[in-house]
Amino acid sequence: MKKVKQIRVLKPFDLLSEELVFIILDLISPNPSDLKSFSLTCKSFYQLESKHRGSLKPLRSDYLPRILTRYRNTTDLDLTFCPRVTDYALSVVGCLSGPTLRSLDLSRSGSFSAAGLLRLALKCVNLVEIDLSNATEMRDADAAVVAEARSLERLKLGRCKMLTDMGIGCIAVGCKKLNTVSLKWCVGVGDLGVGLLAVKCKDIRTLDLSYLPITGKCLHDILKLQHLEELLLEGCFGVDDDSLKSLRHDCKSLKKLDASSCQNLTHRGLTSLLSGAGYLQRLDLSHCSSVISLDFASSLKKVSALQSIRLDGCSVTPDGLKAIGTLCNSLKEVSLSKCVSVTDEGLSSLVMKLKDLRKLDITCCRKLSRVSITQIANSCPLLVSLKMESCSLVSREAFWLIGQKCRLLEELDLTDNEIDDEGLKSISSCLSLSSLKLGICLNITDKGLSYIGMGCSNLRELDLYRSVGITDVGISTIAQGCIHLETINISYCQDITDKSLVSLSKCSLLQTFESRGCPNITSQGLAAIAVRCKRLAKVDLKKCPSINDAGLLALAHFSQNLKQINVSDTAVTEVGLLSLANIGCLQNIAVVNSSGLRPSGVAAALLGCGGLRKAKLHASLRSLLPLSLIHHLEARGCAFLWKDNTLQAELDPKYWKQQLEEMAP
């Protein structure tokens, strides 16, 4: 009997080469749900997706054996969702990923020891980057084990407060290929350890020494590094004029210097620090104690090619700002946030020299008026970012100029300003606008918002916090015109109803939804967003009394990317809270003053949410929950925040704003 030949029927995708499929995967990789759909299409796609993926961010360390068995080409492993990573878990990583792994992030993980790190270092011989920030129990013995990872190029040890010079010395000797090192808040490390690092690791390009008890002594060695590009000295109180007096260097490679919060540094010390940094591009002097005067600005003579300067919280004089504009006229970014002494005269003399300015931050510069805004608009046509929160003396007419003259704006913060609908009409001409903050803008209405909806189709972020003139009509125009919206804040816009939520459900890319203090929204509106906005990651429903279990059940079923939720002061019971356990990536939950909750229901919900990192609960529950449960959850990586606030009547927004202004300096 003849055997019948089986004819293999080729499917269309069988003709695609592996390289072409990988290109397709690169294009859809930003959306995890698309990748999942692709891999579930057929066996060959499942295998190709497994072979292609190089970056993983698992929700729990328990999943590591299964995940790493499937994805054998993993090069970047991010375990920040895993608060508890044991030595066994690190052993699994070493055995299954081995020579393939190049980057590992343990910055929010604990429970591992030197033994686990040693297995990792010996197995992952090509590891070039590891983040061990927040390992507050890490000691010198652990650092000696890290030194076994000879291929390391980037190492972060922020807040490893038990480390000393000895541990850093071990790393310096063992990891000579290091080019990026962060020791921020490693308060046990001083001049000796930093000096050893500079002597042994000649390839260092980025060095973060913020809040270390160092002096200018170790800077002599650091500034000899031929490839050093970024040096961060934030909060280094030991770096003062005396310790820098004899400093002489020629660090032509240095491009960024952060000397913010160096309280003992004046223009004399800064002159020494900048003496050989002729190619410096970015300088941060925020919260320095010295007045930014003509003398201080003169220290910038050697860095005339500077492109960015931050003077947040500093006391500045008009002469100082004028000198900065004259000496550094190539500046593209200037930040004067909370510089309360900035005046129209000073700012105008600065910006009129900066024709290339792209970013300007004048947040809380309360002395500025229309004069400054006029000068900014006329002098800086290339501006892409303008932050001017709480510039309350700026009149309504000035905002019209911003829209007419600064058409390239992408980011605009007008929180707590006098802008009105005519101002919004002008700003709608900024077609590239992606972030617009209009919180506490009491003069705007739906009419003004409709201009934004029709003109700014690229809008990604919109903040309407306490802008009480906004209703469903305005939100509807935004939802229709700004379909790429990712973040919206409508908190305390009390006329908002479910109609707005139904409109916003058309914005399928929505990730952050804040509606705190909106009494007229219900679970029906929330369900509409949950069903259609699959990327939803953060939801704030505090003080929304009509939100109940039905809304949470919808979120639990449809919003599988939800990471943070606040349901304080709502009608939610333990039924809705328990349903949240169905969301595998939920990390933060806040539930305070919800009378429908029983301690047993809260306990069950907390146990069910296995990836929980932070829980904000009412203080009364602390004595009602079993102590063993609290200890168990803390061991699992969950931190508790107990709140004892009582319900307060909401203030009228105008009265609330008046109180805020009276508190301001």
Swiss-Prot record:
Residues 11-60 form the F-box domain. GO terms for biological process: protein ubiquitination; ubiquitin-dependent protein catabolic process. LRR repeats lie at residues 61-81, 82-108, 109-134, 135-159, 160-185, 186-211, 214-235, 236-261, 262-287, 288-312, 313-338, 339-364, 365-390, 391-416, 419-440, 441-466, 467-492, 493-517, 518-543, 544-569, 594-619. Keywords: Leucine-rich repeat, Repeat. GO terms for cellular component: nucleus; SCF ubiquitin ligase complex. It holds the Pfam family LRR_6. Disulfide bonds: none annotated. InterPro entries: Leu-rich_rpt, Leu-rich_rpt_Cys-con_subtyp, LRR_dom_sf. CDD domains: F-box_AtTIR1-like. It comes from the Eukaryota. PANTHER family: F-BOX_LRR-REPEAT PROTEIN 3, PARTNER OF PAIRED, ISOFORM B-RELATED. This is F-box/LRR-repeat protein 3. It comes from Arabidopsis thaliana. The lineage of its organism: Eukaryota, Viridiplantae, Streptophyta, Embryophyta, Tracheophyta. The gene is FBL3.
